[in-house]
Structure formats: structure tokens, C-alpha cells
Amino acid sequence: MNLVSIIMPTYNCGRFIKESIDSVLAQTYDNWELLIVDDCSTDDTEAIVRGYKDKRIHYMCNEQNIGAALTRNRALREAKGRYIAFLDADDLWLPEKLEKQVAFMGQHGYQFSYTYYSEMDSDGIDTGITVKGPFKITKAGMYAFCWPGCLTVMYDAQSIGLIQIEDIQKNNDYALWLKICKKADCYLLPEVLARYRRGRSGSVSSQRISTMIKWHYKLYRDAEMMQVIPSLWHTTMNIICGAYKKIKYVKHN
């Protein structure tokens, strides 16, 4: 049974992190390590995490606040698992998430995968929305739009290797996918295996279109080191594909 390293950066998520950790502890697949990297929270995050005595849970705190991108990088450097999975400190997994996704990748020889997820509000109440996506995302497809939800992604670190991203303020999960998609296509496991907490502070997807354009443009310029014209092109494609996703893949139950 291969080890799965779960990457959980956190900052002032004391209200939600216990529920997120409990969703990891409830997994039917038990060979995992949970790497919680705290970016200098000022709430009770540390006390909550240290209340867990499970040796698979590892808590680290940055010496100073360095932002989500570098915090995620630190967790990735510490990871020992063959597979890398991601769970933000306010999101949740369903119990069979790891078991089903590891099996899916192993059976088909996939190196990079994602799943459907449902949405809940800030109080954990189901909104009736399910987010799906295309079965296969190529490099071109990933550059066109960030199809996977971060909480659903898993990749084979044995094949992909260590991934580190630039110090960007937003879209750092998307920056990771753009690195990985150069080495492997991303495949969909078509089942809801995670719950995303909608309405979180700072989420790019919850901001107005002008703000989304700004952060996507900076992603291509700063993280991918693209020239102006290609950056503008991919930013435009992101806006178009975002509208398409809402029509094609965001389902109201």
C-alpha cells in the first residue's frame, strides 16, 4: 500500500481545521501522512492540531508569514509519499476519497488525476451544487483553464518529481497544475469525493471578473514567465473557459 502525502497549508483556519483533519482520519485508506504547515496563524489553529496524537499528523509552523505558495512548497519538500494529495484546512473529503483515487490511478497507470466535488456554504450546509469536468486534460487544456478543484487532485510524485512554484499571491494551486501538466495529462475519476467550502476569503473564483483577469495574467507572467501576448491570450481563454465550465460542468441538483 503506497504512502499518500496530504498537503494542508493553513492560516487562521481554527474554525474549520478540526473538521478537515477528521475527514482525513475517516479515510478508508490508512497509509497516509498529513503535513500541516501553518503560516503563522494568530488563532487557535496550533492548539487544535496539537490536540491530535496520531503520529501520521505532522504540524510545522513557518518562522514568519510567507504566503500560501511558499507554505505549500515547504510541505511538498517534506512529503515522503509516492502520491501527493491536497486538502485546504477548510475543505472536506468523503471517506473513500484516497482509496478510490489511488486505485483509479494504479489500475490505469495515470500519474495525475482529479475528481468531482460538491459545494457547501461557510457553515457546512450543502448548496446543491456539484462541479464536474472533462475526462482528460492535456497541457493545452490545463493552460486554457484550471479545471480541477485543488481538494480533488492527486499526482504520482515518483513519476513527476518534486514540484515547486514561484512566490505568487494567488492561483498557487493552478501554478502547480501548470508544472505537472508538462509531464502528464490529468484524468478524471467521475465521482464526488470531496466537499469545497464556498465563500472563503481571498478565493479568486469568488471575485469579480476584473480581479480574476489581474491574477490570471500575473500567473502566466510571473509563475510561467510568459511574454505579454501569450499571457493575455491564456488569460482571455481562462475567462471564456470559465463561462463554459459554468454551463457544461457546474450542476445544480
Regions found by a protein language model. Give the residues of each.
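Glycine-rich, basic loop-to-helix element that forms the pyrophosphate-binding segment
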Residues: N62-A79, K100
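N-proximal low-complexity "stem/linker" segments adjacent to membrane-targeting elements
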Residues: M1-L25
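Short aromatic/hydrophobic "clamp" motif used to bind/position activated sugar donors
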Residues: I84
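Conserved nucleotide-sugar donor-binding catalytic segment
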Residues: R77, T130-T211, W215-H216
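Acidic helix N-cap motif at the loop->helix transition within catalytic regions
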Residues: R15-K18, D43-G51, L92, E96
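A conserved acidic beta->alpha catalytic loop
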Residues: S23, D30, D38-A47, Q64, ...
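The conserved acidic donor/metal-binding loop of glycosyltransferases
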Residues: D88-L92, Y116
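Conserved donor NDP-sugar-binding/catalytic core segment of glycosyltransferases
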Residues: E96-T127
